[in-house]
Amino acid sequence: MKKFFAAIVALMLAMPSMAQFASGGFELDKSNLYYGARFGITFGGLSGDTEVQDANLIMDYSGRKTGITLAGVIGLRLSQTAPVFLESGLYYTQRGGKDGKYTADLNCLEIPLLIKYGIQAADHIAVLPFIGPYFAYGVAGEREYIDETSGEKQKEGVYKKFLNRNDMGFKLGCGLEYNLLYAEIGYQFGIANIADNDNNTTHANALFVNLGVNF
């Protein structure tokens, strides 16, 4: 993962000169606005104090849980001399964590503020490394576990009892656009403590892969 972060940062620091170049829904050589849609997969987990003590049963949610992402985005060029863009939008994303037969499902609404830099890779292909903060709110969440006494599957809410709804952190990654088609891979790590008590520190994080279109 450290090598992945280093590669993204190095790519963002590389500032090759940009000639006339257009790719799909937005042009890198002039100021304009673009819109997009995203659909993808997340591999979420919880870090820090991820154990929940309940009736002498310890559940650790640090393992990866697969979820989906749906989003609409909007982007705006920030500079007249360089292909630097600000992209935001509204994301619905499923995160959480698991450990064997125990899972924690977190459904969140998320607003990122991403800085993207456009690099011409080939004709009609743009490489777009990005980094920026995100702000998230948990709209629904539950934990699922097997009751040790009855052996039956149980569910209960996690917000207000174990976790806070508000979250924030940073995203970084890299996108690739070909004509209207867009793909990206990245990682997001929470910096806000979402544990619902002062004795624990819990952060949400996720690896994500998204596909979509830019108009």
Task: Name each model-derived stretch.
Residues 21-32, 78-84, 120-126:
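Short loop/turn motifs that connect adjacent beta-strands in outer-membrane beta-barrel proteins
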Residues 1-30:
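Cleavable N-terminal export/targeting peptides
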